[in-house]
Amino acid sequence: MDGFEAALEMIKPHATGLVCGSVLSIAFNTVARRNPDARRLVAGTPLYIYAVAMIFQALVFAPAAYSAWSRWNFDPQWMKEGWTTARGTVNVDPMGEKKRLERVYLYALFGYMIKDMWIFRTDVLFFAHHLICLFGIAAFFAIPAGIGAFVVGGTVLELGNFTYNIVLLVGKDSGKTVPAKVKHYAECLYATCMPLSNLVGGVMFVWFAGFPRLEGTPWVTGLGTAWFALIAGREYVHLSRSVPYFAKHFKAKRALAKANAEASAVAAKLKKKT
């Protein structure tokens, strides 16, 4: 229990930030859904959910991660630091200026996960996914190293989710108002970016697992189980969508090419007869 209690003591100072992040995220959802058209269902989900998610992914997480790392001139060592270390400096205040952007990122990510929990309370997979994420985020307030790696790795995964939101909005199952080319390009974007996001996220965790103060610890085992379970779920969804789509797409292209070849052969024969 000592380790668990110590972790709780490290998380406690962040309680206000986590509550603020959650309240602001829920408020963002509330404002976004005020327009009746924003509550229109797309692939079974209200349109505003996609809009809010994509705003967080592109305009909150990515810029926050960039800003946090850029403060250290993109030094890879930043990814290995804990809450009390910074470029070899020890006894850094976790609630101080040096860790401000990292804290804000995690508060925003926590609120982002909280905001839809009630809305999707009956969706077991969604609820379980977000619950695992919430426990993982909380754990990172107590972890001895690798804060930056989580900030960047989490952003990489969220950018993969960004392409998933795009494909749900304008992909193969979208309405007739979306041009066929747009649908296909959306499917191509998702089919490329989601597995790339999963690959980078997986490689980053393997690197993370070897950090000093983390290698061989329960942190790696526990967080690794959750991390790779989430990646496996994401990849399952990706393959379930992209493999049938592109199998059908290329089959149609081959059939069209065959039909064109046969038509050309018939035309050539007719030309010879004349």
Residue ranges and their predicted role:
Residues 155-156, 160-165:
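Functional transmembrane alpha-helices
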Residues 1-157, 170-274:
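Membrane-helix and juxtamembrane interface regions of eukaryotic multi-pass membrane proteins
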